């Protein structure tokens, strides 16, 4: 299992921008975040002497994003939501957050993010902004036996 803990503020994948001539480009904030995460992941992969997961290997990815509560909240409310690990329901969307991390891991942790077959995500309040990523092989388990399979074929 590959585990990466980052004390960074997670950034959601920004929509592509277009130049006047019509060329698409990734917003700077998104590109900088992806570059930083890619660099940290590459460093960790090398230090652990890990191989990149092949595209043919199904993977399970679990990511927990942590955000500090707004400074505008009262001290009591901030402390309460941190202690209770309350889910964060405001921007940025989980789907945009995970896309940024998946893209940063392309070619570093796995060959392509299409090999991620299962996702487990969470977005919570914590004392400091951070995120933790777990990537592991997905064990394929056949949930039903041969008798159930033959019954399904008969129907």
Where are these regions (language model features)?
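Acidic, proline/glycine-enriched N-terminal capping motif
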Residues: 1-155
């Amino acid at each position: 299992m590959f585990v990466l803990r980052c004390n960074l503020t997670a950034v959601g994948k920004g929509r592509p921008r277009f130049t006047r001539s019509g060329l698409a480009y990734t917003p700077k904030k998104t590109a900088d975040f992806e570059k930083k995460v890619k660099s940290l992941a590459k460093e960790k992969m090398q230090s652990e002497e890990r191989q990149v997961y092949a595209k043919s290997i199904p993977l399970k990815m679990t990511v927990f994003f942590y955000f500090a509560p707004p400074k505008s909240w009262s001290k009591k409310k901030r402390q309460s939501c941190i202690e209770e690990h309350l889910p964060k329901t405001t921007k940025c969307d989980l789907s945009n957050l995970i896309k940024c991390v998946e893209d940063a891991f392309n070619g570093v942790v796995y060959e392509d993010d299409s090999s991620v077959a299962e996702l487990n995500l969470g977005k919570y309040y914590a004392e400091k902004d951070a995120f933790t990523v777990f990537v592991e092989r997905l064990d394929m388990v056949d949930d039903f036996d041969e008798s159930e399979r033959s019954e399904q074929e008969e129907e």
